[in-house]
Amino acid sequence: MYSIPAGTNSKLELFLEAKPAGNQFYPCFLQGFDNARDTMTEQEFLTHHQLTRNPFADEDAQTDSVFREFCISGTFHPSWSKVVGDSKQPATAVVFGSKGSGKTAMRLQLMRHITAHNEQFPEQRVFLVEFDDFNSYLGALQEHLPLRQQSSPDKVLHSLRLWDHMDAILSQGVTQLVDRILQTNASNNIPAMSVRQDAIDRLDRGQRRDLLLLTATFDHSKTGTLYTRFSALKKRLRFITLNPWMPVVIGVESSALAIWLSYFLYQSDSEWLKYLVWLLPAALALAWGMFGYRWFRHHLLAIRVCKNLRVLQRDPGQLRQLLMQFSDVELDEQPLPQSQRSDDRFALLEKLQLLLRSLGFPGMIVIVDRVDEPELVNGQAERMKQLVWPLLDNKLLKHENFGIKLLLPSELHYFIDRETREFHERARLDKQNVVASFDWTGEALYDLIASRMRACASPDARPSPRDFFNADLTETRFIAALQSLTTPRNVFRFLYRLITEHCKRFRSETPQFKIASDLFESTLAVVQAEDRRQ
């Protein structure tokens, strides 16, 4: 019979405590359960090696707390200096790297480096634009196309042009700038990235007009409506224009005068004066004609802009309402995206750069990442090519005081070598800082592991990767194994799995803190096989 202790509440505890008196019989699976409770834990292994947490638990730099807290400013890929360049003279860099090679980590490090540069040189700051969320722009482009093309992702991506990408970059840049001026969220209050109020006050009227015009055209915020943000910015800039209201004032005054005259003429005893009443509608039409002409002219302009601004959703009526707040003299001959060509976009980019220079940002850097993630791309190499290739134009890549950091999947490098002479003459990749293969050597991966272990170590501890293994596993073999895994993500996955498998082999009563070479080799083979299948 089983003895059941009094006061047992949990059914699991009741089951486990129901052991036979005298140990005549004890189910095998319960013995295994007891053994599992005594298995050596990962934390015991880490504590023995003076580690406070597992350095290899995270594989994605976006969520990797060890990287963000300790390694972001001290552990770099060997190609780091070529990619980052000189922040005082922004330049383009093109990186081709496989999944897990560290492109996202490099993006975060670039952002950190630019922030540090801006703190050190407040008069030579760099305006950073993150261009890594393509879904909203591609969705708007898809809706602008004919119905027969909307259902085909290849046709949508094939229709992309350089000016579409420039519109998206201008939208990102203008939206960020307006956010910082209006201080719409806490992230815009970072001193290294904020816009000083005295610099805003020093803008001349032409620059204020340019900023408002860029806002009306490109602002694409999720925190407020376009009209609300435009009005708030106009108030902040103290931009007052009376000329646009003159046609309305003339029309209202003329209407009031016409009503008075019609009453006067109708009361007149003279018959011929009464006939003049019929001329008043023509006079009213003439009085309001100036306003009507201006309304119609701006409405046509708004329609042209909305039609050719394919990566943003714009309402012609709302845009017309904003454009009519500028005088005709201030609006005439200003570049607007009212045709499908890149010249207008370069002129608008230069206007944005001049504004940024006056606000303390003489340089501008755009970081392009995650080109494999948009819904229309879905990780397909051919579609990634259609998305990225329009950006590879030397006129943009070598634009003055402007740099693009393109962090691209390694699959795209295959297409580079097979492109036409015309493509290479347009892109001039020989003039860009190209990292053709974002590879890691075994030694570099070893140093990366060591730095992460030091970041997770107890105070005054100096752990080494070699401390994990038995003496029969040589350092040469360990580095060669790391080389075969090629990327940090694969290495972290391998080491995490290796520690887990090692702990499963031993009980807490008889722990072993050195990993055997046979387990090392077998786990390595499994991880390599899984990587080949992906």
Question: What spans do the regions from the language model cover?
Answer:
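C-terminal alpha-helical "lid" subdomain
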Residues: 210-250, 277-279, 310-311, 459-534
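The catalytic "switch" region of P-loop NTPases
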Residues: 16, 29-48, 73-77, 114-117, ...
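Walker A/P-loop-proximal flanking segment of P-loop NTPase domains
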Residues: 12-134, 140-151, 224-253, 529-534
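Intrinsic disorder/low-complexity segments enriched in small, polar and charged residues
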Residues: 8-10
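Amphipathic alpha-helical scaffolding segments
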Residues: 109-116, 125-126, 383-389, 497-500, ...
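An acidic- and aromatic-residue-enriched active-site/binding cleft used to recognize and process polar
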Residues: 98-101, 131-134, 369-376, 409-412, ...
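Short hydrophobic transmembrane-like helices used for membrane targeting/insertion
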Residues: 1-4
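P-loop NTPase nucleotide-binding core
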Residues: 101, 105-358
